[in-house]
Amino acid sequence: MKIVENQPVVRRQSPQAEVTLTLPARPEAIAFAPQETALIVVDMQNAYASQGGYLDLAGFDISATAPVIANIKRAISAARAAGIKVIFFQNGWDNQYVEAGGQGSPNWHKSNALKTMRKRPELMGKLLARGDWDYDLVDELQPQAGDIVLPKPRYSGFFNTQLDSLLRSYGIHHLVFTGIATNVCVESTLRDGFFLEYFGIVLADATHQAGPQFAQQAALYNIETFFGWVSDVDSFCNTLAAPLSQTA
C-alpha cells in the first residue's frame, strides 16, 4: 500500500522567495515559488511529435501528440505570465553522428533513431540531425525572448549540458516537466535531477510515451512513487493564475 502524506511538501525556501504556491499533485501537493521554478519542455521536436518524424518512421504511435502539444502550449503561456523560466530541450547530434558515439557507446546500440537509419540508409543525416526538419521544434512551440534552448546528446537533459549550472545560477530548485517521451527522456532527466536535489513535477497530460500506454502508466507510477510528483496542466495553470487574479 502506498503511503500518502496529507500535508503538502515544502522545501526550505530562500529568503528572497516572494510568493509560494501549492500545486495539487500525487502523491501529495507540493509547494513552490515561481521564481525558483523552471518549466522544462523536453524534445518537442518534429522527430517526436510529427508525422514523418523519427518516432513515426521507427514505428511508434504518435497519433495522440496533438493534445499534448496544445497542453504544453497552455503550460508555457501560464509559466511565462508567472515569471517561471522556460527551458526547451532538443535531442540529437551533428549530421555525421559523431556526437552519438560509435560502437563503443551503448547509445549506438540502443538509440532507435540510429538503428532505424542503419536499416534505412536513405534516412542517414535526416533523423535527429541539427539543421534538419526532424531536429526542429514543432511550429506550435517556439521559444521567445528570455527562454532557454539547450541541445542534449543523450536521454537525460543533465548529461553533458549546461542545465545544472544554469538552474543553480538562477536559484531554481523546482522543475516542472512536459514533453516526449515520458518513459525515456522526461523520466531520465527527472531522475537525474532528483539525484542533484531538484524537486521534479510532471504534468501528465502534457507528456506522451514512446511505446504502448502501459509505458506511460509505468513511468508516472515510478515518478510519483520514487522520484517526484505528478500533476496536470489545469491544476498548474489554475495554481499560477490565482495570485495573478488577486493582484489584477
UniProtKB/Swiss-Prot annotation:
SUPFAM superfamilies in alphabetical order: Isochorismatase-like hydrolases
GO molecular function, one term: hydrolase activity, acting on carbon-nitrogen (but not peptide) bonds, in linear amides
Active site as annotated: D43 (proton acceptor), K152, C185 (nucleophile)
CDD domains: cysteine_hydrolases
Any one of the GO BP annotations: uracil catabolic process
Keyword set, alphabetical order: Hydrolase
Known catalytic reactions: (Z)-3-ureidoacrylate + H2O + H(+) = (Z)-3-aminoacrylate + NH4(+) + CO2; (Z)-3-ureidoacrylate + H2O = (Z)-3-aminoacrylate + carbamate + H(+); (Z)-2-methylureidoacrylate + H2O + H(+) = (Z)-2-methylaminoacrylate + NH4(+) + CO2
EC numbers, comma separated: 3.5.1.110
Pfam families: Isochorismatase
Keyword flag Protease: no
Entry keyword annotation includes NAD: no
InterPro entries (alphabetical): Isochorismatase-like_dom, Isochorismatase-like_hydrls, Isochorismatase-like_sf, RutB
Role, per record: Hydrolyzes ureidoacrylate to form aminoacrylate and carbamate. The carbamate hydrolyzes spontaneously, thereby releasing one of the nitrogen atoms of the pyrimidine ring as ammonia and one of its carbon atoms as CO2.
PANTHER family in alphabetical order: ISOCHORISMATASE-LIKE DOMAIN-CONTAINING PROTEIN (PTHR43540:SF6), PEROXYUREIDOACRYLATE/UREIDOACRYLATE AMIDOHYDROLASE-RELATED (PTHR43540)
Family, per entry: Belongs to the isochorismatase family. RutB subfamily.
UniProt name for this protein: Ureidoacrylate amidohydrolase RutB
